[in-house]
Amino acid sequence: MYPELLKWVTIYIIIYIVPTCNVPSANNMGNLGTKAAAFAAFSMHSRTMFHVKHFHRKAPMKKKTKPLRPRRRLVGGIFLLIALLLAGFFGYCFALSRVLRVERATVYLPDLPQSFDGMTVLFVSDLEISGLSSAGEAASLMRRLALLKPDVLILGGDYASGSLMDALNGTRDEAALSAARQRFFSALADFPAPMGKFAVAGEQDAGAAQMEKEMAAGEITLLNNAVGRVSLGGESISIAGLAPQGEGILDYSGLSRSFQKGDCVLAVAHNPAAISAVMTAEAGDSGVWCDLILSGHTHGGQMILGKHSMLTLSPQETRYPAGWSKESGVFILVSQGVGCEIVDLRLGTEAQVHLITLRRGLAL
């Protein structure tokens, strides 16, 4: 702005002011000299302005771009931070899956015979063994649980399942799963449960005939829509094992009618989707036919984020996701299980087994 103003001021001086100036001179040449000097000054100023303008036009072309290295470092740092956060998150979820809690509970049953007052039941479900090494870990776990000295051991199904790679590839090695189950069941031969060891099958397990063969090595009784009886002091209680959901219609009336009101019955169903059918079935003389229902399968959702879970549960399973409840005088337990489906990760849930003490009478 200022160079332009100076230029026009100079022109104005030359044209209008210089001719009228009273410059001391001997003749007209003095006035002409003054004009020439002014013109020369203007010419020099014009050249100066040209160079200034030329400089201002060229300067933007010489501007250097900023180096990209700091930006690349920033992006790399962000990705590294995200990777570390994800690694920490999944590491935490994996650690949760490896911590087993022994949940203790006391249940009061009015129909429990006096001889069984104080009897303890260890309920273990959903081991989800994925190979021989995993079977060895499960066997080692059971040796530690033997220190609890339960009177009865009840296994809740889904003993072996495929690995993450099997799930991704859509494959299932039945021979390998059978070998893993056999190793686990064989390790239970010395498990101290003086009143018996009972089990039901889950949807991921083999057929009843194959499961009976595998469990025989561990002296475990498979209950597939069948009843096991425990006797003590001339009295007895019944353990009714229900077949997995995939084997026929959920109608347990044939089983329930074999009992009378007042009998003490523990019902074991791998999937809590069967609980509604168990509750609607009636005893031979009508009324509720069981006192306690034990179930598993859901893993509690395994990973819980807000109202969403990693596992897709049916409406029936969602009704009994995990924990204790009571309906029509019947106690219901849905365990979150020991193992995990597909991958060993938990969030908002826990690996658990249950040591249940049965007492005669009504809850205080």
Positions of predicted regions on the chain:
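N-terminal Lys/Arg-rich, disordered targeting/topogenic segments
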Residues: 13, 45-73
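N-terminal membrane-anchoring alpha-helices
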Residues: 61-112
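Beta-strand-turn-beta hairpins that frame and shape the catalytic cleft
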Residues: 109-122, 220-221, 228-241, 260-264, ...
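Membrane-embedded segments
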Residues: 119-221
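Active-site neighborhood of phospho(di)ester-bond hydrolases with catalytic His/Asp-centered motifs
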Residues: 123-125, 153-158, 196-203, 223-226, ...
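Binuclear metal-dependent hydrolase catalytic cores centered on His/Asp/Glu-rich metal-binding motifs
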Residues: 209, 213-226, 232-285, 346
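Conserved beta-sheet core of the metallophosphoesterase superfamily
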Residues: 273-354, 362-363
